[in-house]
Curated annotation (Swiss-Prot):
This is Protoheme IX farnesyltransferase. Keywords: Cell inner membrane, Cell membrane, Heme biosynthesis, Membrane, Transferase, Transmembrane, Transmembrane helix. It is a multi-pass membrane protein. InterPro entries: Protohaem_IX_farnesylTrfase, UbiA_prenyltransferase, UbiA_sf. GO terms for molecular function: protoheme IX farnesyltransferase activity. The gene is ctaB.
Amino acid sequence: MSSLAAPQTGLLRQYLVLTKPRVTQLAVFCAVIGMFLAAPGMPDLSHVVFGTLGIWLLAAAAFAINCLIEQEVDARMLRTARRATARGTISDIQVLSLSGLLGGAGMLVLYHLVNPLTMWLTFATFVGYAIIYTVILKPRTPQNIVIGGLSGAMPPALGWAAVADSVPAEAWVLVLIIFIWTPPHFWALALYRNNDYIKAGLPMLPVTRGQQFTRLHILLYSFALLATTLLPYAIRMSGALYLASALALGGMFVWYAWRLYREYSDALARRLFRFSILYLALLFGALLIDHWVGLLR
């Protein structure tokens, strides 16, 4: 029995890696925040549960397709060379089947147990990431992250739609925050993984325009991000607690970007990349806490 279980466990682990669980977790977290912000009180828990499930399934399906399309590129990069698709230990048919199963299940869950709007928006996000970004933008332009960042910024709108069956201006403000956050987040990664991207032949900004140009644009985007995160307070979507959090977190982001601009090191770029993930989670957490505090007044 144990000899049979080991290969099955290994295959399941390979499938899980292809769905990029860490990235999926952050995306789904932002979607869930959108769900809770969409309701003046406690949202319909069935919509929260099934909305979360459906969005997670389609996100996982998109990431699996991404790994399939980029398997040759991944094989040339140290960071991704151990993926099953890059090593050839899992077939294209298996990945397509996995993605089709996850994506189909996600669409059924969202359509029948949440609402059609959320299903179509999530499907459009799937196409935007798996096809438009991965196939068209990423291998062709250094602005791939900027243009293609919209698909990665959509989770709050998807979550909002799951609860409210609409996507008002407040939801698009959250999308805008992630949209502005995306370039400095990925450019920091591209800086300290620059050799990987050169080997892979991908036109990331540090490859095409150089390190100094990229560092400057990370700094400029960090200021733009700080300004953008003040919008929820400006439109009275949030209160003083969120404002203080946005200023503190944004100030730290600018500080990291300024240090990276003044004196580059791979360690600083890696530190900014990791902080940017924590930054987004804390910022959206502050939005939710501020929302709940407002409900108690």
